[in-house]
Every structure is written in C-alpha cells, then in structure tokens.
From Swiss-Prot:
InterPro entries: HflD (IPR007451), HflD-like_sf (IPR035932). It comes from Xanthomonas campestris pv. campestris (strain ATCC 33913 / DSM 3586 / NCPPB 528 / LMG 568 / P 25). It is found in: Cytoplasm; Cell inner membrane. This is High frequency lysogenization protein HflD homolog. Gene3D superfamilies: HflD-like (1.10.3890.10). Disulfide bonds: none annotated.
Length: 204
C-alpha cells in the first residue's frame, strides 16, 4: 500500500472500528480485547510515519475496513455509527486548532504510555481509565460533542465510561491521521469510488 487514498482508508478504518467498539460497549458492556488494544496502541504510536506503523498492519484494521465496505455498499447495520464518525471527524478539526488542548493531550498520552509500559499492558483497566480521564478533561469540552447512546445500566458504570472515552480518544487520533494523509469530508462526495477501490485493495 502506497497511495494516499490507501493510507486514508486505513486511518478511516481506525476511526470506524474504534467507534464500533464504543457502540458495542455502550449497548452490551463488553468489548473485543484485540480491537481495543489496537485502538489504544494507535494512541501511543504518535511518531509513526504511516498508518501501518500506527496500527501494526492493515490486518489490524480489517474490522474497520469491513465496516467501511458495508457503509459504501449500503449494508451497514448500525445507523448511529456513521453519525458518530462524522462527529469525530468534525471534532478533529476543532481539536487540532486548539494548541493548548493538543499540548495537554500530548503530555497526558506520554504519561499513560509510561503507565502502560510499567503495567505491561496497553489495555490495562488503569491505562484505559487514565486515557478516559484525559479525554473527559480535554477533548470532551470541544464542539461538536460526541454523544454516545446505549444501555443506561452500562453507561452508569465507571469502567465502561472510561473505556468508551479511551476509545473516543483513539477515534480522534485516527481522525487526525486521516487528515494528515490528505483526508477530507469532500472525499465522501467526490472520491467515493476511489475510497471503495482502496478499501477493496486493503481487504484482499
């Protein structure tokens, strides 16, 4: 994979699969450990030059690529997911322009990365709690506010809320990468075919 569109769809897949886990946790209280770990690891790989470097490989965002394929072919089963994704892509614009918030988030990520290294697990509950608190103290105050709906029983649990916020932070990180790779909301109008073809290549 080398074209900018190939890179963009990998980053967009990162957004999609992080948000799918947000939806899953909000509804069921449970997540897929491997997908959560990929999302959290992407937050810590801030110096990676390519999407493959951020996620590990295209295989690690295969769930997100399948979500994109289903969206583009009108087979998506969760109407809330595209709305969440749009909110995150819009939120990314506000975030990167707020230099004070960017600096605070960067320092918080560095601290959480050290904690993950000490604990030996990037998806440890304490790490998720730290990342969730970081999101709550910073990005969650920006607009548009990402509204997560789900089962009130689970959304009332501190651990569930922390994991959701950590995944929202990961989604924003992927949105930043998408924009760095040349992504734009105009792609969905004027480059849809190129996006579909790039997703198909990534899934081969």
């Amino acid at each position: 994979m080398s074209s900018s569109m190939d890179h963009r769809v990998l980053a967009l897949a990162g957004v999609a699969q992080a948000l799918q886990q947000v939806r899953r946790i909000a509804e069921t209280g449970h997540s897929e450990a491997a997908t959560v770990r990929t999302a959290v690891d992407s937050v810590f790989r801030v110096d990676a030059a390519t999407p493959e470097g951020v996620y590990g490989s295209s295989a690690d965002v295969a769930p997100g690529l399948r979500l994109l394929h289903n969206y583009f072919t009108n087979q998506g089963k969760d109407d809330m997911l595209p709305r969440l994704a749009l909110a995150v892509l819009q939120l990314e614009r506000r975030f990167v322009r707020d230099h004070s918030t960017v600096e605070t988030v960067s320092k918080g990520i560095e601290a959480a990365a050290r904690q993950a290294q000490t604990l030996g697990d990037s998806a440890h509950p304490d790490v998720l709690s730290a990342l969730g608190a970081l999101y709550a103290q910073t990005i969650s105050h920006l607009r548009p506010k990402v509204m997560v709906q789900g089962n009130p029983h689970y959304l009332g649990q501190a651990g569930v809320v922390a994991e959701i916020r950590a995944l929202l932070l990961a989604a924003v990180r992927s949105a930043v990468l998408w924009r760095q790779m040349g992504g734009s909301l105009w792609d969905f109008l004027f480059a849809k075919r190129a996006m579909i073809e790039a997703v198909a290549r990534a899934l081969r």
